[in-house]
Amino acid sequence: MLDHIGIDVQNYEKSKAFYKAVLAPLGYELIMEVQGWAGFGVGGKPDFWIQGGKQTIPRVHVAFRSDNRERVRSFYEAAINAGAKDNGPPGIREMYHPNYYGAFVIDLDGHNIEAVCHNPE
Protein backbone atom coordinates (compact mmCIF):
# COMPACT_ATOMS: atom_id res chain seq x y z
CA MET A 1 0.00 0.00 0.00
CA LEU A 2 1.38 3.39 -0.99
CA ASP A 3 1.73 5.85 1.90
CA HIS A 4 3.05 8.99 0.19
CA ILE A 5 4.92 10.27 -2.84
CA GLY A 6 7.23 13.23 -3.42
CA ILE A 7 8.13 14.96 -6.67
CA ASP A 8 10.71 17.56 -7.58
CA VAL A 9 9.70 20.97 -8.90
CA GLN A 10 11.84 23.79 -10.23
CA ASN A 11 10.04 26.72 -8.61
CA TYR A 12 8.83 25.85 -5.12
CA GLU A 13 6.59 28.88 -4.52
CA LYS A 14 4.89 28.74 -7.93
CA SER A 15 4.34 25.00 -7.67
CA LYS A 16 3.07 25.28 -4.10
CA ALA A 17 0.45 27.83 -5.24
CA PHE A 18 -0.37 25.67 -8.27
CA TYR A 19 -1.00 22.54 -6.21
CA LYS A 20 -2.96 24.43 -3.55
CA ALA A 21 -5.38 25.53 -6.29
CA VAL A 22 -5.41 22.30 -8.29
CA LEU A 23 -5.85 19.85 -5.42
CA ALA A 24 -8.45 21.87 -3.48
CA PRO A 25 -11.38 20.46 -5.51
CA LEU A 26 -10.25 16.97 -4.43
CA GLY A 27 -10.32 17.96 -0.75
CA TYR A 28 -6.54 18.37 -0.47
CA GLU A 29 -4.89 21.19 1.42
CA LEU A 30 -1.36 22.25 2.27
CA ILE A 31 -0.78 20.55 5.61
CA MET A 32 2.86 21.25 6.37
CA GLU A 33 6.18 22.53 5.12
CA VAL A 34 9.36 20.86 6.34
CA GLN A 35 12.93 21.58 5.19
CA GLY A 36 12.00 22.72 1.69
CA TRP A 37 9.17 20.24 1.21
CA ALA A 38 5.45 21.05 1.06
CA GLY A 39 3.06 18.29 2.06
CA PHE A 40 -0.52 18.17 0.77
CA GLY A 41 -3.22 15.81 1.92
CA VAL A 42 -6.69 15.19 3.29
CA GLY A 43 -7.65 14.94 6.94
CA GLY A 44 -4.35 16.20 8.31
CA LYS A 45 -2.17 13.51 6.69
CA PRO A 46 0.12 14.66 3.89
CA ASP A 47 0.52 12.04 1.17
CA PHE A 48 1.70 14.21 -1.74
CA TRP A 49 4.92 16.21 -1.37
CA ILE A 50 6.82 18.66 -3.56
CA GLN A 51 10.44 19.74 -3.18
CA GLY A 52 11.71 22.85 -4.92
CA GLY A 53 14.86 23.82 -6.72
CA LYS A 54 15.42 20.43 -8.30
CA GLN A 55 15.74 19.24 -11.86
CA THR A 56 12.45 17.63 -12.87
CA ILE A 57 13.66 14.83 -15.10
CA PRO A 58 12.40 12.18 -15.31
CA ARG A 59 8.81 13.36 -15.37
CA VAL A 60 6.25 11.39 -13.37
CA HIS A 61 2.56 10.49 -13.60
CA VAL A 62 0.54 10.90 -10.40
CA ALA A 63 -3.18 10.07 -10.21
CA PHE A 64 -5.40 11.39 -7.41
CA ARG A 65 -8.56 9.40 -6.67
CA SER A 66 -11.84 11.25 -6.44
CA ASP A 67 -15.11 10.01 -5.01
CA ASN A 68 -17.18 11.65 -7.77
CA ARG A 69 -16.92 12.91 -11.32
CA GLU A 70 -17.77 16.51 -10.50
CA ARG A 71 -14.56 16.77 -8.48
CA VAL A 72 -12.61 15.42 -11.45
CA ARG A 73 -14.11 18.17 -13.63
CA SER A 74 -13.37 20.81 -10.96
CA PHE A 75 -9.77 19.56 -10.67
CA TYR A 76 -9.30 19.89 -14.42
CA GLU A 77 -10.78 23.39 -14.54
CA ALA A 78 -8.67 24.55 -11.57
CA ALA A 79 -5.53 23.10 -13.15
CA ILE A 80 -6.08 24.77 -16.52
CA ASN A 81 -6.83 28.08 -14.76
CA ALA A 82 -3.62 27.70 -12.72
CA GLY A 83 -1.48 27.31 -15.84
CA ALA A 84 -1.49 23.57 -16.53
CA LYS A 85 -1.62 22.23 -20.08
CA ASP A 86 -4.40 19.92 -21.20
CA ASN A 87 -3.34 16.28 -21.49
CA GLY A 88 -6.83 14.77 -21.72
CA PRO A 89 -10.09 16.47 -20.72
CA PRO A 90 -12.52 14.88 -18.25
CA GLY A 91 -14.16 11.81 -19.68
CA ILE A 92 -14.60 8.05 -19.68
CA ARG A 93 -11.48 6.01 -20.49
CA GLU A 94 -13.05 2.65 -21.37
CA MET A 95 -9.68 1.12 -22.23
CA TYR A 96 -9.09 0.91 -18.45
CA HIS A 97 -12.64 -0.05 -17.41
CA PRO A 98 -16.22 1.12 -18.13
CA ASN A 99 -16.40 3.55 -15.18
CA TYR A 100 -12.86 5.01 -15.40
CA TYR A 101 -13.55 8.75 -15.49
CA GLY A 102 -10.33 10.74 -15.61
CA ALA A 103 -8.80 14.08 -16.48
CA PHE A 104 -5.13 14.67 -17.24
CA VAL A 105 -3.00 17.82 -17.14
CA ILE A 106 0.68 18.64 -17.48
CA ASP A 107 1.86 20.68 -14.49
CA LEU A 108 4.35 23.55 -14.45
CA ASP A 109 7.29 21.11 -14.59
CA GLY A 110 5.98 18.67 -17.17
CA HIS A 111 4.57 16.07 -14.77
CA ASN A 112 1.39 14.27 -15.88
CA ILE A 113 -1.16 14.87 -13.10
CA GLU A 114 -4.50 13.07 -13.16
CA ALA A 115 -7.73 13.00 -11.20
CA VAL A 116 -9.77 9.81 -11.53
CA CYS A 117 -13.12 8.52 -10.33
CA HIS A 118 -13.89 4.80 -10.58
CA ASN A 119 -17.55 5.11 -9.53
CA PRO A 120 -20.47 5.10 -11.96
CA GLU A 121 -22.22 8.43 -12.53
Q: Where are the language model's segments positioned?
A:
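Core segments of cupin and vicinal oxygen chelate
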Residues: I7-D47
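Vicinal oxygen chelate
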Residues: N11-E13, F64-D109
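A short linear hydrophobic-aromatic micro-motif
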Residues: G27-E29, W49, D86-P90
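Long, continuous compositionally biased terminal/linker segments
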Residues: F40-N81
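Glycine-rich acetyl-CoA-binding "A-motif" of GNAT/NAT acetyltransferases
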Residues: N112
